[in-house]
């Protein structure tokens, strides 16, 4: 091979290598394109790691039950009986989670308490709670939370009066279930009370506290609505 042929061969090889490098550079993309592709890949990975909606619902329900269990241990001295935060927790959890999830949270609160989680009032729990005259009120928490969840439904203005009306109704519902249950348990124990006696024992002393808790829930929710708009 002559010297000129060797020079031509070497020049051709250099041109081929240069073209190959340019092709690889185009395939790899610019640094900006590479960074964008990496971000898209990371976003797709985060999307795959997002929490399943069913799992999220279960977490919300259990957290709602835990909030009520925690507030059930809070007691404020008030005449004629102390006021606990239990019903207030029911109202707020129902409003926060909505009708169905709020009611589901109260079902979880009741069932887990029955199987032994000590989050009923005074850190009590267990199957024996079913035999207590006050257990009917816990049953009533289920429809109470459902009604509370209705407070924020609809597109109309959520005025203080409207919210207070919903929460007052939700406060009444535990008594609708609790008073007959109380009468039935006491009757099974041989302690028969008249209608007036049941009202005096299970309703009248709790009216002031019920009004206060409905008002507190109304104020808290109204502040939340205003803050969310702002």
List the predicted regions and their residue ranges.
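Compositionally biased, intrinsically disordered low-complexity segments enriched in Pro/Arg/Gln/His
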Residues: 24-28
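Generic alpha-helical transmembrane segments of integral inner-membrane proteins
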Residues: 62, 66, 70, 92, ...
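Membrane-interface elements of multi-pass transporters and channels
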Residues: 74-81, 100, 115-119, 123, ...
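Short helix-perturbing small/polar motifs within transmembrane alpha-helices
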Residues: 30-49, 56, 70, 127-176
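Residue-level signature of transmembrane alpha-helical entry/exit and packing/kink sites
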Residues: 53-61, 86-90, 102, 133, ...
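Alpha-helical membrane segments and adjacent membrane-interface helices in multi-pass membrane proteins
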Residues: 72-147
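Hydrophobic transmembrane alpha-helices
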Residues: 2-11, 29-105
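Membrane-embedded alpha-helical hairpins and interfacial helices in multi-pass inner-membrane proteins
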Residues: 155-230
